[in-house]
């Protein structure tokens, strides 16, 4: 990314992960992150995982990048989570909680981070695109759909019956 001069949108230490943000050619946000060891996460007794937003050291990240061989995504790499821009985060949260059985991990006004099990988030919904976010139209550039892989088939059967 440094060699290609890909503009970074931002970066943050979230307590459970460190992330760098950029945009693709369609203006979809992309988060590249590294999960910290679980024993460093702020996991509450009720299972909620509290996140923070603190500054990353840009110079430190730049120096690390200079030492690495060219990056190749490993075979079998999976997307860890998806962020969705929505008009109403509470309605979207309720939909995904009911339809996929996801649990609240962290919620603030206008955004929720939800997950299955003890992960910090598999899906996040936010209203940061604004209340007047236009509905997606056929043929529109951008994310049309995503696929959710369920590892526990019994869970899925129970959820759907």
Feature roles, as predicted:
Residues 1-29, 86-90, 128, 144-161:
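Vicinal oxygen chelate
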Residues 8-11, 101-106:
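Short secondary-structure junctions
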Residues 14, 81, 120-122, 145:
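Histidine-centered active-site/metal-ligand motif
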Residues 16, 78, 108, 142:
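Exposed loop/turn and edge beta-strand positions of beta-sandwich/beta-sheet ligand-binding modules
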Residues 29-36, 103-140:
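Conserved short beta-strand elements that form part of the metal-binding/catalytic scaffold
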Residues 37-90, 143-146:
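N-terminal beta-strand motif that seeds the catalytic metal site of vicinal oxygen chelate
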Residues 88-104:
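Amphipathic alpha-helical segments
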Residues 98-99, 123, 158-161:
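Long compositionally biased, domain-poor regions of proteins
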């Amino acid at each position: 990314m440094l060699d290609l001069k890909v503009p970074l949108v931002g970066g943050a230490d979230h307590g459970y992960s460190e992330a760098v943000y950029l945009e693709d050619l369609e203006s979809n946000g992309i988060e590249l992150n590294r999960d910290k060891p679980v024993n460093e996460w702020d996991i509450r007794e009720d299972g909620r995982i509290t996140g923070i937003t603190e500054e990353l050291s840009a110079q430190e990240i730049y120096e690390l990048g200079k030492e690495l061989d060219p990056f190749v995504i490993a075979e079998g790499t999976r997307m860890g989570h998806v962020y969705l821009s929505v008009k109403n985060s509470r309605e979207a949260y309720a939909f995904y909680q009911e339809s996929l059985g996801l649990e609240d991990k962290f919620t603030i006004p206008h955004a929720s981070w939800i997950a299955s099990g003890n992960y910090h988030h598999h899906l996040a919904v936010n209203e940061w695109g604004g209340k007047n976010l236009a509905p997606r139209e056929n043929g529109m550039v951008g994310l049309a759909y995503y696929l959710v892989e369920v590892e526990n088939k019994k869970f899925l059967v129970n959820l759907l019956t």
